[in-house]
Amino acid sequence: MKEMDIVELIVEKEKYAKEGVHKGMQGWICYDKCVRGYWLVNFSQYGEKDDIATTSIHETDMKQIPRMDARNNEVICEQFRE
């Protein structure tokens, strides 16, 4: 993986959930270095809304995907707000 790659979180873990990030959310790698297996990933929302989080995600907890749809992140957020 490298900076600017689009990724999807493939696990549900408490440490990510505390940041508001859940399985299925999509983000992009926003730092060019991997530190001890972790990449800094930004999870945004659609349009001009504030980002959900920018947090370190272990490379085994995500997969690279061809394109991002931030609206997907908003749908997942709503499921956890209920």
Question: PLM ranges: what are they?
Answer:
Residues 2-70:
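Basic/aromatic-rich interaction segments and small domains that mediate binding to polyanionic partners
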Residues 66-82:
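Long, low-complexity intrinsically disordered regions
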